[in-house]
Amino acid sequence: MEINRDEFKEVVVNIGRVTKVVKGGRRFRFNALVVVGNKNGLVGFGLGKAKEVPDAIKKAVDDAFKNIIKVNVKGTTIAHDIEHKYNASKILLKPASEGTGVIAGGSARPVIELAGIKDILTKSLGSNNPYNVVRATIDALSRIKA
């Protein structure tokens, strides 16, 4: 599958800061969670870590392009209900009638929007850890049968 990066939009879902205390003070490192998608059925996510935020985002985008999945979209929504659990995060996805819009909270919204789904109902249950919610959403979307 040939991927043209120009067609893809990227959204930074989360930026985390990790502090290491050393004798001379504090050392900061950053991690970035990024979702990429072409709004036409292709979506992926990546995690990047670096000493500076822009470097972490660049690494995350590169990682996201290695993890792209194809989502089976039926019109403007999905074909059937699906529930998926990843670690302590659980996501519930339900098809919605046309004109409903994307009803999704937190980290699940960018994944669904970048996948090109326009009408869907979602509920995030359990842990709201951004990485786990994004991973659960992507895993759920990849399991949808056409």
From Swiss-Prot:
<keyword id="KW-0687">Ribonucleoprotein</keyword>
<dbReference type="GO" id="GO:0006412">
    <property type="term" value="P:translation"/>
</dbReference>
<dbReference type="InterPro" id="IPR013810">
    <property type="entry name" value="Ribosomal_uS5_N"/>
</dbReference>
<feature type="domain" description="S5 DRBM">
    <location>
        <begin position="8"/>
        <end position="71"/>
    </location>
</feature>
<dbReference type="GO" id="GO:0003735">
    <property type="term" value="F:structural constituent of ribosome"/>
</dbReference>
<keyword id="KW-0694">RNA-binding</keyword>
<dbReference type="Pfam" id="PF00333">
    <property type="entry name" value="Ribosomal_S5"/>
</dbReference>
<dbReference type="InterPro" id="IPR005324">
    <property type="entry name" value="Ribosomal_uS5_C"/>
</dbReference>
<comment type="function">
    <text>With S4 and S12 plays an important role in translational accuracy.</text>
</comment>
<dbReference type="GO" id="GO:0015935">
    <property type="term" value="C:small ribosomal subunit"/>
</dbReference>
<comment type="subunit">
    <text>Part of the 30S ribosomal subunit. Contacts proteins S4 and S8.</text>
</comment>
<keyword id="KW-0699">rRNA-binding</keyword>
<dbReference type="InterPro" id="IPR000851">
    <property type="entry name" value="Ribosomal_uS5"/>
</dbReference>
<keyword id="KW-0689">Ribosomal protein</keyword>
<comment type="function">
    <text>Located at the back of the 30S subunit body where it stabilizes the conformation of the head with respect to the body.</text>
</comment>
<dbReference type="Pfam" id="PF03719">
    <property type="entry name" value="Ribosomal_S5_C"/>
</dbReference>
<comment type="similarity">
    <text>Belongs to the universal ribosomal protein uS5 family.</text>
</comment>
<dbReference type="InterPro" id="IPR018192">
    <property type="entry name" value="Ribosomal_uS5_N_CS"/>
</dbReference>
<protein>
    <recommendedName>
        <fullName>Small ribosomal subunit protein uS5</fullName>
    </recommendedName>
</protein>
<dbReference type="InterPro" id="IPR020568">
    <property type="entry name" value="Ribosomal_Su5_D2-typ_SF"/>
</dbReference>
<dbReference type="GO" id="GO:0019843">
    <property type="term" value="F:rRNA binding"/>
</dbReference>
<dbReference type="InterPro" id="IPR014721">
    <property type="entry name" value="Ribsml_uS5_D2-typ_fold_subgr"/>
</dbReference>
<dbReference type="InterPro" id="IPR005712">
    <property type="entry name" value="Ribosomal_uS5_bac-type"/>
</dbReference>
